[in-house]
Amino acid sequence: MIRSVRRTLLLVVGLVQCLAAVAQRPDTLRIVFIGDVMSHGPQAMAALRPGGDRNNPADYDYSACFRHVRDRFDAADYVVANMEFPCGVTPYSGYPFFSAPQSLAYEAKRVGVDLFLTANNHICDQGRVGIDSTYVIYSRMGVPFTGVYRSEGEEWEKNPLMASIKGYDVAFINFTYGTNGLDVPKPWHVNLLDTAHVQAVIARARERGADLVVALPHWGEEYHLLPSAQQRWWADFLHRNGVDAVVGGHPHVVQPVEFEPPFATAYSLGNFMSNQSDVNTQIGMLLELVLVGTTGGRLQIAEVRPTYTWCSRRRMLEANYTVIPILDWIGRRDEWLDKSDYDKMVREWNAFQKQFNL
């Protein structure tokens, strides 16, 4: 299995190198995806301004979190993030029943995230109140989001989410395997992985003129570096039914990317930002899909570009949590407040590269 994964990762590297010239075409479109944006309790406490009110979202400052990847967002035409928490229910809380200050969502929007994913196993952590609060806050922000809905009619109308990007129509479909055993108030409140429903939504995407269909499943087994048999089954099912790209989340570690044109599958982007520190949970992937127009007017995937990231926790690299591209920071140990975090990053990154022959 590891040998197969190595071949897959090498195939991605080779295709990126061979197709580099494609990215210069005027009809090129770039979509960036980041993994799980978590809101553990220590993250919120680190963002709380000195003397701030814990129940006042304006007293939280998340500006440090995205600053070292902002240039990647700026270079993209569209940025997608998995926002793995209900938003705005006080008192704010971390694991196991999350509720994040809306200032985290506002900061994500400010730095260039264009689409929030909400169908994940924590969306029901605060019950119907949390779903409604998340819906209202994101709607007032004016940021597109997908995965939760307020009525059956709205689910039909807004699922998939259709985004117009540089004149192309891209369909985004976000599903979750479940909600940690918590009840979903109504079947249409949260998109769940169900074969018949998934097929229906993919069909809607094509009927509504999608030039590219992207599925964003919340799936898999936590902390497993290789995709499960169920993930592979679903990936095959999605592609056979009309999905061009699959970009997954939930395992909290990075899993392989497979690019066999015309399809691309990223099984898990891992954590983008969290308080987790177990082996491999601080390594994430910022994934860029480079797309080009076809003679038929649709989009095809020309390149898959992974950027591996490291989530540095409070008082490690900086005073607050921040996410950095690993390769940009190799050799800069002196800049860390706590050198042990640099050493941990290098150690885990070297082991990760060795395991997957990067």
Which residues make up each language-model segment?
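Bacterial N-terminal signal peptides that target proteins for export
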Residues: 1-9
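Hydrophobic h-region of N-terminal signal peptides that target proteins for export
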Residues: 13-22
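Acidic, metal/ion-coordinating pockets
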Residues: 24-358
